From Swiss-Prot:
The gene is Slc1a1. Contains eight transmembrane regions plus two helical hairpins that dip into the membrane. These helical hairpin structures play an important role in the transport process. The first enters the membrane from the cytoplasmic side, the second one from the extracellular side. During the transport cycle, the regions involved in amino acid transport, and especially the helical hairpins, move vertically by about 15-18 Angstroms, alternating between exposure to the aqueous phase and reinsertion in the lipid bilayer. In contrast, the regions involved in trimerization do not move. It is found in: Cell membrane; Apical cell membrane; Synapse, Synaptosome; Early endosome membrane. This is Excitatory amino acid transporter 3. Homotrimer. Interacts with ARL6IP5/PRAF3. Interacts with RTN2 (via N-terminus); the interaction promotes cell surface expression of SLC1A1. Interacts with SORCS2; this interaction is important for normal expression at the cell membrane. It holds the Pfam family SDF. Glycans are attached at residues 128, 178, 194. InterPro entries: DAACS, Na-dicarboxylate_symporter, Na-dicarboxylate_symporter_CS, Na:dicarbo_symporter_sf. Residues 39-61, 115-204, 266-285, 380-392, 427-439 are extracellular. Sodium-dependent, high-affinity amino acid transporter that mediates the uptake of L-glutamate and also L-aspartate and D-aspartate. Can also transport L-cysteine. Functions as a symporter that transports one amino acid molecule together with two or three Na(+) ions and one proton, in parallel with the counter-transport of one K(+) ion. Mediates Cl(-) flux that is not coupled to amino acid transport; this avoids the accumulation of negative charges due to aspartate and Na(+) symport. Plays an important role in L-glutamate and L-aspartate reabsorption in renal tubuli. The chain crosses the membrane at residues 19-38, 62-82, 94-114, 205-228, 238-265, 286-307, 353-379, 440-461.
Length: 523
């Protein structure tokens, strides 16, 4: 008698395990179809477009809701679960990986844009400008980055970031607006038309989570409670429970994800007004997308394979849900809950690694953004007929790397840092408006590359930290089996029937006493 076929069972198991991924892919395809049909057969007002995208807005709000508790709980528990020396080694390996891949991405982008030359055949006046240029000073932006690493108010850091703005000092004192000046300092003077302009620095707070400041605090807080022993264990247990509860909420949110993604992609297709710009900037877009494809399909998998010696594409397949989410919502921070779930449940990466590495990676590891900024800067130089020297190309490389590390994981942060890169080599900052029209699409693909780089980083750091993690496991098992190693020793005196001595830092009291101490006393 032959074996009963199990193909039906396997098919059902496959659907049960991958229904969310399949439904998300179907939602993307359906969203494109719906967007094209609605755009072609009806004229929607701006108000109608806003209402149409409402279900997608709800998805974004739900994902952003869990970012704060997830980052705080995961960072604290991840650091507290490890020895400070182990945490330092893991952190160093993660930073080296992030920096190395970012530098490789920048070099790759520059090689491609110099070879393809997408801006040589076009002129600046042939491309329509869109939007307005962000007002950014390189020095002020870098100082703001350092300031935000050390927030003065922890509660405020959960919903606001510090930002400075330059204001021209007018001869007559004319206080305007309701803005509160946090600090006022004479910044600089410039000569324009033989007139001296004086500026002052005004400190403001803008909406948005200060992720970098929270990560620094959680890192220190986790190290401290990890060294407190039993006194800090109650806090470790609390944040562990908070992390687990947050991940349960993420599972509920992901059930709604296909619906939200459908309306997100359809709403964006309906919203775009000028599709002609895609033809004009087609070669530039092809250069950026080619660089992102090479980095994500060749460079990152090759590094993973060399270090881990496993199939990188199987690992990437396990991250498919997170990559699709990043592609649709274009925010690595908002994708973080899904990235956690895929890395831990699909690829079985150690939670001590994911909780420590992923929040940091979502903040400072921006391979796709760095590549995009390098390509865009050289492209704008080509549009202006400017021949870049080796020194200027090196300047672009360094600035793009530094700016991408400082960019927050929020939509279109690349445009803000793009101004810094352009200013570093003397290119007109207003030319960033030439590429804004297509940035919404490129932003999605570079965010996907950013998330993929974070994911590969967890696998690589886990492999390199295997020995330290095993040592932590062994020491934990010893403590769990016999944490205090108490063995009563009879005192050699007349009261030996009722008294016991200190052994290994613990002590026992006479059985006739009401309370019996069985744990080590800490002095």
């Amino acid at each position: 008698m032959g074996k009963p076929t199990s193909s039906g069972c396997d098919w059902r198991r496959f659907l049960r395990n991958h229904w969310l991924l399949l439904s998300t892919v179907a939602a993307v395809v359906l969203g494109i179809v719906v967007g094209v049909l609605v755009r072609g057969h009806s004229e929607l007002s701006n108000l109608d477009k806003f209402y149409f995208a409402f279900p997608g807005e709800i998805l974004m709000r739900m994902l952003k809701l869990v970012i704060l508790p997830l980052i705080i709980s995961s960072m604290i528990t991840g650091v507290a679960a490890l020895d400070s020396n182990v945490s330092g080694k893991i952190g160093l390996r993660a930073v080296v990986y992030y920096f190395s891949t970012t530098v490789i991405a920048v070099i790759l982008g520059i090689v491609l844009v110099v070879s393809i030359k997408p801006g040589v055949t076009q002129k600046v006046n042939e491309i329509n400008r869109t939007g307005k240029t962000p007002e950014v000073s390189t020095v002020d932006a870098m100082l703001d980055l350092i300031r935000n690493m050390f927030p003065e108010n922890l509660v405020q850091a959960c919903f606001q970031q510090y930002k400075t703005k330059r204001e021209e000092v007018k001869p007559a004192s004319d206080p305007g607006g309701n803005q509160t000046e946090v600090s006022v300092t004479t910044a600089m003077t410039t000569m324009s038309e033989n007139k001296t302009k004086e500026y002052k620095i005004v400190g403001l707070y803008s909406d948005g989570i200060n992720v970098l400041g929270l990560i620094i605090f959680c890192l220190v807080f986790g190290l401290v409670i990890g060294k407190m022993g039993e006194k800090g264990q109650i806090l470790v247990d609390f944040f562990n429970a908070l992390s687990d509860a947050t991940m349960k909420i993420v599972q509920i949110i992901m059930c709604y994800m296909p619906i939200g993604i459908l309306f997100l992609i359809a709403g964006k297709i309906i919203e775009v007004e000028d599709w002609e710009i895609f033809r004009k900037l087609g070669l530039y877009m092809a250069t950026v997308l080619s660089g992102l494809a090479i980095h994500s399909l060749v460079v990152l998998p090759l590094i993973y394979f060399i270090v881990v010696r496993k199939n990188p594409f199987r690992f990437a397949l396990g991250m498919a849900q997170a990559l699709l989410t990043a592609l649709m919502i274009s925010s690595s921070s908002a994708t973080l809950p899904v990235t956690f779930r895929c890395a831990e449940e699909k690829n079985h990466v150690d939670k001590r690694i994911t909780r420590f590495v992923l929040p940091v990676g979502a903040t400072i590891n921006m391979d796709g953004t760095a590549l995009y900024e390098a390509v865009a800067a050289v492209f704008i130089a080509q549009l202006n007929g400017m021949d870049l020297s080796i020194g200027q190309i090196i300047t672009i490389s360094i600035t793009a790397t530094a700016a991408s590390i400082g960019a927050a994981g929020v939509p279109q942060a690349g445009l803000v840092t793009m101004v810094i890169v352009l200013s570093a080599v003397g290119l007109p900052a207003e030319d960033v408006t030439l590429i804004i029209a297509v940035d919404w699409l490129l932003d999605r693909f570079r965010t996907m590359v950013n998330v993929l780089g974070d994911a590969f980083g967890t696998g690589i750091v886990e492999k390199l930290s295997k020995k330290e993690l095993e040592q932590v496991d062994v020491s934990s098992e010893v403590n769990i089996v016999n944490p205090f190693a108490l063995e009563p020793t009879i005192l050699d005196n007349e009261d030996s029937d009722t008294k016991k001595s200190y052994v290994n830092g613990g002590f026992s009291v006479d059985k006739s006493d009401t309370i019996s101490f069985t744990q080590t006393s800490q002095f």
